[in-house]
Amino acid sequence: MQTHNNVDPQEIAKFEKMAATWWDPEGEFKPLHNLNPLRLNYIDQIAGGIFGKQVLDVGCGGGILSESMAKIGAQVTGLDMGDEPLDVARLHAIETGVLINYVKNTAEAHRDEHRGQYDVVTCMEMLEHVPNPSSVIQACADMVKPGGFVFFSTINRNIRAYVETILGAEYLLKMLPVGTHDHNKFIKPSELIDLADKAELFCSDAVGITYNPITDIFRYTKSLEVNYMIATVKND
């Protein structure tokens, strides 16, 4: 097996430090808990239902998305490089009686033995935390079956995104620990779609996510100016 090093140790350490609160709906990962129903619905709707399908969740962390997909019948493999988040994910799956295969590995290394294996691959809120996003995108493309779906979510790179996700969410509203995000690692939709296209993933849909701090509610929006998701299909 090849060795792949598309990992930022500082990013891994950052999320390992917060792992103990991963499943606290009022803790540091509250935004992910509130956002997850929108992510799950989008994935399930666009993919034509994930019940009974082989799904790979790249950058699964403590398993919020992985577990929700398994609960609606997907056969889920969760992939991450953080020991503590994976331990939390495995323990919570046992507590809730959900079967999920959690694996410590990079997307690139996992690809070596899993080419064309998955019906659906998800890579949510992960690309902005790795040194080489294009390498992860290519690995995701290699692991999905022809005609299968790969979903990505990340944050746009512009002034508004900086104000809302860093100044607003981290410093003002204290929704996230300071230092969670680096604006320089954010990815414009045009850049993400171009990288996906180079990996032979056709962008079939895109949607934005907006947050109202007054109502504490996330909702879909046509605007991709800040948080957004794209759905891509592997060319046959």
From Swiss-Prot:
The GO annotation for biological process reads: methylation
Q: Which terms does the record give in the GO molecular function aspect?
A: 2-polyprenyl-6-hydroxyphenol methylase activity; 3-demethylubiquinol 3-O-methyltransferase activity; polyprenyldihydroxybenzoate methyltransferase activity
Keywords for this entry? Methyltransferase, S-adenosyl-L-methionine, Transferase, Ubiquinone biosynthesis
Q: Indicate which residues the UniProt annotation says bind S-adenosyl-L-methionine.
A: R39, G59, D80, M124
User: Could you name the domain of life of the organism this protein comes from?
Assistant: Bacteria
Documented EC number(s) = 2.1.1.222, 2.1.1.64
Q: In which pathway does it act?
A: Cofactor biosynthesis; ubiquinone biosynthesis
The reaction(s) annotated as catalysed by this protein in its Swiss-Prot or TrEMBL entry are:
a 3-demethylubiquinol + S-adenosyl-L-methionine = a ubiquinol + S-adenosyl-L-homocysteine + H(+); a 3-(all-trans-polyprenyl)benzene-1,2-diol + S-adenosyl-L-methionine = a 2-methoxy-6-(all-trans-polyprenyl)phenol + S-adenosyl-L-homocysteine + H(+)
**What stretch or stretches form a coiled coil here?**
none
Q: Does the keyword Hydrolase apply?
A: no
Query: Short name of one Pfam family for this protein?
Result: Methyltransf_23
NCBIfam families, alphabetized: UbiG
Query: What does the UniProt record say this protein does?
Result: O-methyltransferase that catalyzes the 2 O-methylation steps in the ubiquinone biosynthetic pathway.
Please give the name of this protein. Answer: Ubiquinone biosynthesis O-methyltransferase
Lineage runs: Bacteria, Pseudomonadati, Pseudomonadota, Gammaproteobacteria, Alteromonadales
